[in-house]
Swiss-Prot record:
<dbReference type="GO" id="GO:0003746">
    <property type="term" value="F:translation elongation factor activity"/>
</dbReference>
<dbReference type="GO" id="GO:0005737">
    <property type="term" value="C:cytoplasm"/>
</dbReference>
<feature type="region of interest" description="Involved in Mg(2+) ion dislocation from EF-Tu">
    <location>
        <begin position="77"/>
        <end position="80"/>
    </location>
</feature>
<protein>
    <recommendedName>
        <fullName>Elongation factor Ts</fullName>
    </recommendedName>
</protein>
<comment type="function">
    <text>Associates with the EF-Tu.GDP complex and induces the exchange of GDP to GTP. It remains bound to the aminoacyl-tRNA.EF-Tu.GTP complex up to the GTP hydrolysis stage on the ribosome.</text>
</comment>
<comment type="similarity">
    <text>Belongs to the EF-Ts family.</text>
</comment>
<dbReference type="InterPro" id="IPR014039">
    <property type="entry name" value="Transl_elong_EFTs/EF1B_dimer"/>
</dbReference>
<dbReference type="InterPro" id="IPR001816">
    <property type="entry name" value="Transl_elong_EFTs/EF1B"/>
</dbReference>
<dbReference type="InterPro" id="IPR018101">
    <property type="entry name" value="Transl_elong_Ts_CS"/>
</dbReference>
<dbReference type="Pfam" id="PF00889">
    <property type="entry name" value="EF_TS"/>
</dbReference>
<dbReference type="InterPro" id="IPR009060">
    <property type="entry name" value="UBA-like_sf"/>
</dbReference>
<keyword id="KW-0648">Protein biosynthesis</keyword>
<keyword id="KW-0963">Cytoplasm</keyword>
<dbReference type="InterPro" id="IPR036402">
    <property type="entry name" value="EF-Ts_dimer_sf"/>
</dbReference>
<keyword id="KW-0251">Elongation factor</keyword>
Length: 270
């Protein structure tokens, strides 16, 4: 068996963030092999975190952006969310997503970040910090993009992030990104709204009109009006502009010479 010194234990503790006794036992089991000992600790602590975290929610966190990538990284508390290690890891993961052009969580988890995968980086971060940490969402767009990030409080990292892919003038795209952050549209055009959802909204609007005792001959028109109101809530191009309330977002974008091709909006906890 290798001779394990206090310096060896300290070195492994600094490397993994595990307790002194866990580090000593891992080094003994690995016969002094640091790489093997670190892996043993990661497995052991990872199992403990999984057991403890099964019923815990990672409903805090932040949104980070890099180039054409937008990433949400979740944790349990805002205290961890604003910590330097968590913020730095989120930015590194966003950088990795942009470089690899990774547009979904599983693909991003497999991307190499130094000598580890992104998935392993997230696991190690959870072990070091001691909270449930999850890679929540990721989006990647190829074309020209603008990003807009919003903080809920000055001392917290961004909790809302928007990524807009566009053609034409950048200024219009920036305005659209702010609109998306504030008004939470779910679709770009009404054609993107699933047919079953439109049918359900139409059914609700019609039933509401009848319950209110509206004249039968007026129900069809009232229903269409209410359905148009629904579209104004959920469709970006049909929303009233937050900067020019008498105009739709589409009208403002047309005047700016901007076409929004697609967008992503991530909000921590939503």
């Amino acid at each position: 068996m290798a001779n394990i010194s206090a310096a060896d234990v300290k070195k492994l503790r600094e490397l993994t963030g595990a307790g002194m006794m866990d580090c000593k036992k891992a080094l003994e089991e690995a016969d002094g092999d640091f790489e093997k000992a670190a892996e043993l600790i990661r497995i052991k602590l990872g199992k403990k975190m999984a057991e403890r975290g099964a019923e815990r929610e990672a409903s805090n966190g932040l949104v980070a952006t890099s180039g054409g990538a937008l990433v949400e990284l979740n944790c349990e508390t805002d205290f961890v969310a604003k910590g330097d290690d968590f913020v730095a890891a989120a930015q590194q993961i966003a950088d990795a997503a942009d470089e690899a052009k990774a547009g979904d969580v599983e693909a991003l988890k497999a991307v190499r970040l130094g000598d580890k995968t992104v998935g392993e980086v997230v696991e190690n971060l959870a072990i070091t910090i001691g909270e449930k940490i999850e890679l929540g969402r990721v989006a990647y767009f190829d074309g020209p993009v603008v990003a807009y990030m919003h903080k809920r409080a000055a001392d917290l990292p961004p909790a809302v992030g928007v990524l807009v892919e566009y053609d034409g003038a950048e200024a219009g795209a920036r305005g659209a990104a702010m609109q998306i952050a504030a008004m939470r549209p779910q679709y770009l055009t009404r054609e993107e709204v699933p047919g079953d959802r439109v049918a359900k909204e139409r059914e609700i609007a019609e039933a509401t009109s009848r319950e209110e005792g509206k004249p039968e001959q007026a129900i069809a028109k009232i229903t269409e009006g209410r359905l148009n109101g629904f579209f104004k809530d959920v469709v970006l191009l049909e929303q009233p502009s937050v900067t020019e309330s008498k105009k739709s977002v589409k009208a403002v974008l047309d005047e700016a010479g901007t076409t929004v091709k697609r967008f992503a909006r991530f909000e921590v906890g939503a």
